Every structure is written in structure tokens, then in C-alpha cells.
């Protein structure tokens, strides 16, 4: 979501690095450029003023001016200040479950902000930490809202409180408290009703619910795609409801990203999670340093490795590596590789985590990042015989025509798949000999150009 900001900052950094020793005037110019980049990304003005002042104060210090590489030093200062802008203490960033079970978590936010989906994602994350979780919908206003949460819960085998038609929110809360004790749940997540806009009735109801539950966390789900409106929403909820933390939803959207840089600073409430995709597994624990590195085009290799480790079987990866080195990487292996990429969020998600991607993102054919391409390629490979998958070189024109018909695709798409298979085979052979940034620039990027 930080594409524009990342590209603008990267251009500024390139000029800084290439300037050699920097004068005060050059630093002033760079700070003006950074200010414009932040404004264009919808970062709130008070945040920009504070950020620029801190960076400039440190950049004008003697230790920077006399540095061997002053441009790199200023980039380091900007990185550190962005971390400070986003970060909270570890004790407040971590989800607070320190209470006698069942622990109550209250989810609040505006309608359409991703609150219900975020509730499901958080429930799944806790389930994967061996917690017994109950999901409770308190939204009796939006049609089928309770059913939506029940469907989400059922899809990941998590319990949800049975729906009683006509029951009011406070009565649902009391029934949920009783059920949670009887069935010994560790955590109960309450999804409150959202509104199209903030109003007193909404706040009064949320306050009454909070008073009964005494939750360890009151989490505000903010839609990152709403720009400056997200900041207004966050401030209103923070002032009236005493929220304990923030979940930023739709962080993967094609937006300016300013909200993510503004809400924590202006509310002084910690960002706890990033909701970064449509799947219920797409919830990341917030890490200021990693997000700052991603924004500044330094990549997020830690997130990349964590995501890969949770999806890719280690033994299978080792077998694939051996096949690559021996030149025996076939279309069965390619299919497994594509399925792993799909589970990790697709090509776009992976590229965003690699260092240096911001500099060449405009050179990439965006249509080739479409997640449907993997689905099409899967259909094509499954239309091949086992012999063809093991020996792609035997796939001649007549075989390609038959495979295309069986998959419901064009022959051109079969040709593209076979070409990409050869390219990936070649690129992956180089992987062990190159660092991630050079690999991206010289190899992987060619697949999408």
C-alpha cells in the first residue's frame, strides 16, 4: 500500500547517496522533498512536522556532516525516526491476555472497515496458539451480520455463539459470558455493531458493553484505505471509548498509506496487528522496524522467511533444492512451487517483501501479478500427462493444443507457462549464489517484465 511513498523516498535517497558530503542546504532540500512525499501519501500534517523536525535536528549534527557517507547516515536517521513514529513499547504492542479465563476482547469500528473479518482472523491466530476461542456477534443492526461471523467461524472450525433472533446486544453479552464459563473458553472475541459514521447511540452501546465485559483489550479496526478519515475515526474512538490498540485493515490495498503512519502518533495507541489480505491467515503481528524497512524499500525479509516457513515443508524444500542443482526440476515441482506462492499471497505479496523492489516496480507488467495466473497454470499442468510433467521438452505443438483444450485455456497461455517454467528454473539455480536484492534485480524481475 506504500508504493507511491516508497518510490518517492527511494528517489530522494538515491540523490542523497550520490551527493557525497552534504551541506546544510542539501539537507534542507532533502527534508522538503520528504515533506512533499509524506503529504502526497496523506500523512497528517502534525505527524509530518514532528517527523521532519526530529530528522533534521539529528541530520545537522556534527557526527553526520563529518561522516564518511553522510547520505547513508541520513537514510539511517530517517529509518530510525520512522520506527519511532510507528513503535510502541513491546508490552503494549503485544495482545493482552493476562486475565483469568475466559479473557474478553472487544472489537469496535465503523461499518465496512473490516472489523468482522479481523475478528475471524484474530480468532484463528489465537486458535493456532492453542487457545479455545469463542466468536460472538453483537451486530443486530446490519442484515446477516451475525450470520457472516458464524460462516467465518465455521470455515476455520472455531465456535461461534448460536444466534437467537430478536435478542439485543446486552442480552447477547450476558448469554455469551455464561456460555464461555460453562464450556471453558480461553478467549471470547466480541464483534460489536459498526455504523456508517460515528454517533452517540453507537458509542453509548459500546460503552455499556465494555462496562459489562471489562475486556483486556478494546481494539479499534481502522480501514487503511480511508485516508485522513481513518485519523478522524481513530481520534473519536480513542477519546470516547478508551481503546487499547489498533488493527489496520486492508493494508494490502492500493492506497497512499498515510493513515498507517498517522493513527498511532495522533492517538498514542499502539498498532497491534496488520490485516494484509483476504484470507483469514492474513493477519500479522505489528512490528514497527519491519514496516519501516518495507516503506523505505529495505525489504521485509523477516516476514518473508516467517511466511515461507509456515507454508513450505522443510523436507520438500530440500528435495526441490537438490533437484534444481541436478537439473531435474520438472513441472510437478513447478506446480508445488506455484501453490506455495499462492499460499503466501501471490507474486505481488512476495515482491513487496524483497529489498529493492520499489525501484523497479513500474517496470513490472502488473497483469502478470494477477493471482488468477497461478490458478490458470495449475489447470494447465493438471491437463498434462505424468510423462509430460516429468519431461516438458516433449511437449510439441500438438500436445500443447490438446493441453490447452483440456484446461479450457489458449495455446498461448500454455506457451507462456512453459517459458516461465524455464525462466524460474534458471533463476532458482542462481539463488544460492546471490543476495536477495541482486537476485530480484537480475532474475525474478525478468519474469514480470
Swiss-Prot record:
Cellular localisation: Cytoplasm
Keyword Transcription belongs to the record: no
EC number of this enzyme: 3.6.5.4
Main subcellular location: cytoplasm
Pfam families for this protein: SRP54, SRP54_N, SRP_SPB
Binding site for GTP: 109-116, 191-195, 249-252
GO CC, one annotated term: signal recognition particle
GO biological process: SRP-dependent cotranslational protein targeting to membrane
Enzymatic class: hydrolase
UniProt KW keywords: Cytoplasm, GTP-binding, Hydrolase, Nucleotide-binding, Ribonucleoprotein, RNA-binding, Signal recognition particle
Catalytic activity reported: GTP + H2O = GDP + phosphate + H(+)
SMART domains xref list: AAA, SRP54, SRP54_N
Molecular function as annotated in GO: 7S RNA binding; ATP hydrolysis activity; GTP binding; GTPase activity
Alphabetical list of HAMAP family matching this protein: SRP54
Annotated domain remarks: Composed of three domains: the N-terminal N domain, which is responsible for interactions with the ribosome, the central G domain, which binds GTP, and the C-terminal M domain, which binds the RNA and the signal sequence of the RNC.
Function recorded in the entry: Involved in targeting and insertion of nascent membrane proteins into the cytoplasmic membrane. Binds to the hydrophobic signal sequence of the ribosome-nascent chain (RNC) as it emerges from the ribosomes. The SRP-RNC complex is then targeted to the cytoplasmic membrane where it interacts with the SRP receptor FtsY. Interaction with FtsY leads to the transfer of the RNC complex to the Sec translocase for insertion into the membrane, the hydrolysis of GTP by both Ffh and FtsY, and the dissociation of the SRP-FtsY complex into the individual components.
Record's subunit section: Part of the signal recognition particle protein translocation system, which is composed of SRP and FtsY. SRP is a ribonucleoprotein composed of Ffh and a 4.5S RNA molecule.
Family statement drawn from the similarity comment of this UniProt entry: Belongs to the GTP-binding SRP family. SRP54 subfamily.
NCBIfam families: ffh
The protein's name in its UniProt record: Signal recognition particle protein
Source organism (scientific name): Rickettsia typhi (strain ATCC VR-144 / Wilmington)
Organism placement in taxonomy: Bacteria, Pseudomonadati, Pseudomonadota, Alphaproteobacteria, Rickettsiales
Gene (name only): ffh
Amino acid at each position: 500500500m506504500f508504493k507511491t511513498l516508497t518510490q518517492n523516498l527511494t528517489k530522494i535517497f538515491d540523490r542523497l547517496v550520490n551527493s557525497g558530503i552534504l551541506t546544510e542546504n542539501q539537507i534542507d532540500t532533502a527534508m522538503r522533498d520528504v515533506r512533499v512525499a509524506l503529504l502526497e501519501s496523506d500523512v497528517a500534517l502534525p505527524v509530518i512536522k514532528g517527523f521532519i523536525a526530529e530528522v533534521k535536528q539529528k541530520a545537522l549534527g556534527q557526527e553526520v556532516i563529518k561522516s564518511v557517507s553522510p547520505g547513508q547516515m541520513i537514510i539511517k536517521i530517517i529509518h530510525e525516526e520512522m520506527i519511532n513514529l510507528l513503535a510502541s513499547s513491546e508490552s503494549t504492542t503485544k495482545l493482552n491476555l493476562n486475565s483469568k479465563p475466559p479473557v474478553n476482547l472487544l472489537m469496535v469500528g465503523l461499518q465496512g472497515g473490516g472489523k468482522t473479518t479481523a475478528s475471524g482472523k484474530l480468532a484463528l491466530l489465537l486458535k493456532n496458539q492453542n487457545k479455545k476461542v469463542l466468536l460472538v456477534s453483537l451486530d443486530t443492526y446490519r442484515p446477516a451480520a451475525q450470520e457472516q461471523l458464524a460462516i467465518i467461524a465455521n470455515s476455520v472450525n472455531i465456535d461461534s455463539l448460536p444466534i437467537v433472533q430478536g435478542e439485543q446486544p446486552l442480552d447477547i453479552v450476558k448469554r455469551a459470558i455464561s456460555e464461555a464459563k460453562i464450556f471453558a473458553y480461553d478467549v471470547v472475541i466480541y464483534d460489536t455493531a459498526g455504523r456508517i459514521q460515528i454517533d452517540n447511540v453507537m458509542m453509548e452501546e459500546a460503552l455499556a458493553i465494555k462496562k459489562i465485559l471489562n475486556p483486556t483489550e478494546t481494539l479499534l479496526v481502522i480501514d487503511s484505505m480511508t485516508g485522513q478519515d481513518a485519523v478522524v475515526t481513530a481520534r473519536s474512538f480513542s477519546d470516547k471509548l478508551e481503546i487499547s490498540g489498533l488493527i489496520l485493515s486492508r493494508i494490502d490495498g492500493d492506497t497512499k498509506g498515510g493513515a498507517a503512519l498517522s493513527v498511532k502518533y495522533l492517538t498514542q495507541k499502539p498498532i497491534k496487528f496488520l490485516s494484509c489480505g483476504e484470507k483469514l491467515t492474513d493477519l500479522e503481528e505489528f512490528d514497527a522496524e519491519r514496516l519501516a524497512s518495507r516503506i523505505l524499500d529495505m525489504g521485509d525479509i523477516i516476514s518473508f522467511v516467517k511466511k515461507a516457513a509456515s507454508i513450505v515443508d522443510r523436507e520438500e524444500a530440500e528435495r526441490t533444492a537438490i533437484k534444481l542443482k541436478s537439473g531435474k526440476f520438472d513441472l510437478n515441482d513447478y506446480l508445488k512451487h506455484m501453490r506455495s506462492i499462492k499460499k503466501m499471497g501471490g507474486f505481488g505479496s512476495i515482491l513487496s517483501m524483497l529489498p529493492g523492489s520499489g525501484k523497479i516496480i513500474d517496470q513490472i507488467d502488473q497483469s502478470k501479478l494477477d493471482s488468477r495466473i497461478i490458478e490458470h497454470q495449475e489447470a494447465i499442468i493438471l491437463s498434462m500427462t505424468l510423462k509430460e510433467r516429468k519431461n516438458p521438452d516433449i511437449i510439441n505443438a500438438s500436445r500443447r493444443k490438446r493441453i490447452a483444450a483440456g484446461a479450457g485455456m489458449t495455446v498461448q497461455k500454455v506457451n507462456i507457462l512453459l517459458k516461465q517454467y524455464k525462466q524460474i528454473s534458471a533463476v532458482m539455480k542462481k539463488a544460492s549464489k546471490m543476495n536477495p536484492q541482486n537476485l530480484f534485480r537480475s532474475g525474478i524481475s525478468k519474469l514480470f517484465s
